[in-house]
Each structure stands twice: as C-alpha cells, then as structure tokens.
Amino acid sequence: THHPSSAASDVYKRQVLNAPMLKSTDGGKSFKRIRVPHGDNHGLWIDPNDNQRMINANDGGANISFNGGKSWSTQKNQPTAQFYRVITDNRFPYYVYAGQQDNSSVAVPSRTNGRGIDWSDWYRAAGCESAYIAFDPNDPVDLYGGCYQGLIEKLNIVTRKSRSIMAYEYLGLGSLPSDQKFRFNWNAPIFASPH
C-alpha cells in the first residue's frame, strides 16, 4: 500500500511510503528515493511546525530525522520487532527464537548480566522472516528454520555454517503454478521430532 503524506508548509512536497520511501517536490510529477535504515515503510509523522523533523515507522522499528530525511537515527537503540511466532529452548537463561517481519530470524536471551538485553546479545537463527524454527530444546545447536516458498535452512550455531535442506530445490517466486513441481505455503510449519 502507498501512504502519501505531505508537509503542511509546502503543498508541492509529497512522501510516499512503501518498500522504498519516495519524495516529490513538484506535487507528484516526479519522485526520488529517500534512503531509510529499513524497508517497508508504514507511517510518517512530519512536525507541523518544523517539516525537517520526521518520524518514520517501518518493519524494523522507528527512525527520527531532523533534516528532512537526509539522515535518520539508528534502530539499534530500540527493542522493536514484529514476530510471526515464538519458540523457546530449555537452557537457563532460556532463549527466545522467532522470525521477524521483513528481517531475519533471531535468537534472543531471556536475560543477561545486569546491563539489559540489546542487539549485541542477539544472534541470527535459521530461516527468514516467516520462520518456524525447530531444534532440540535441551541442546539447541542445530537450528532448522523455514522461509517462504518452502525454503528450509539448517544452521549450526557453533560453526555458524548453514545449508539449504529444502525438499525440492526450486524458488517459485515469479513462476506460474502450472510450472511448479511442488507448491508451498507462505510459511510451512517445521517441528523437531522428540525421538
């Protein structure tokens, strides 16, 4: 979806939010891309008293600009994510695993040594944004994570080596259903056998 917004002080300026953020200074006749820290932009607040101050809401969190979008604040100072589903292991402290909307999957400790949990405590888990994640909850070394279109990744968190273990190696994006040997749901479930 496109969400146009404009600065109250200039009727010719328009911003359009989508995967990219676009800006027009001629009433929408032409647009140029505005660099933002994360894609899939969903909301933009422009200060009615100072159109150089903006807050952009996106799939990675929120970013602030004080110069009309020429530069933006970081996302590494906020615990924001949109999780599809969550699973935990049995360690102490336990870890929370989840696929993040339009981002990677992550493993996050439930606590740290007194300084709070920040991005340096997280690590990438297997799979992608739509991930179901499976592992041995008592020994979560090998992670299995899903992604859209039937993609499955096996990731060893000790060696950080990963490989695709998809049932049928084929990326179906952009192909006709009649040309596909198998069809997959957006996010097919993956479970670890208890045996």
Model-found features: residue ranges?
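Conserved Ser/Thr-centered positions that define the repeating blades of beta-propeller domains
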Residues: S5, S24-T25, S65-F66, V108, ...
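Signature of short aromatic-glycine-proline-rich micro-motifs recurring in repeat-based ectodomains
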Residues: S130, S178-F191
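Conserved beta-strand position repeated across blades of beta-propeller domains
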Residues: W45, I87, A126, A134-D136, ...
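Short loop/turn segments immediately following beta-strands, especially the blade-tip
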Residues: P109-R115, N156-R163
